[in-house]
Amino acid sequence: QDLLIDLNDVERRITPNTKAVIPIHYCGNPCDMDRLIKMSEKNDFKIIEDAAHAFGSIYKGCKIGSFGHATCFSFDPIKVITCGEGGAVVLKDNDIAEKIRRKRILGINKDAWHRYNNERSWFYDVTTTGYRYHMSNINAAIGLVQLSKLDQFIARRRWICQQYDNAFKGLGCIHPLKINYDDVSPFMYIVRVPGKQIEFRSFLEEKGIGTGVHYIANHVHSLFKKYTTKEMPRTEKLWQEIVTLPLHCGLSNNDVQTVIKNVLAFERTAS
């Protein structure tokens, strides 16, 4: 009903070899972190939260980013706030944080104090393998301005989601996910349209309304097919039902009503 990680299934699959579990706060809706933390403590695995959708979401009074051993956020162009491109990792372990800092810029270690004082400012050392993942000052500046508007963005997105929820309640072939938006920073608005995904998307496209599918299941992509050893019937079924409706702060009230009107029009023709 909410497409979050099935913790009953996780519990069945934990073995002594389990090193980490990666819950996804899908659409910005937090997973059951209390239960997952208990499982982590009992079975000695790390929790790496995929919070790409959930910047600003709250779970039981605390911001997402407060729970797992590591939490990953995304600030790409379509997220709740953007830096143009980029993201952030929030960690509880200072040693891991330092390793990530070095890896984000080619494994280079440069003492910040010496740079500030211009002592041997030319000197650096490569201490580990690394990547070019550091953010530019321009991207960071964009992000800081966006951050100052976060509450405004979240409020607008919640309002749109609530308009959709109210309009689509009790429909026969279109089913919104069951999400309480009071503490959620909504990234996407998803409906399930069993057996009519393609028809629904085509209908809205003809009306000038763009939609998406978030996401095509990983195991059906060419790269990952060879690693799929078991059937995943629920995943297979769900990705062919879900449709993403427009949700962003550029939508006017009239735009929202246009989406609602046309979704209801499809419901009448399809029921």
Language model segments and positions:
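Conserved PLP phosphate-binding loop immediately N-terminal to the Schiff-base lysine helix
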Residues: 1-9, 20-36, 43-74, 80
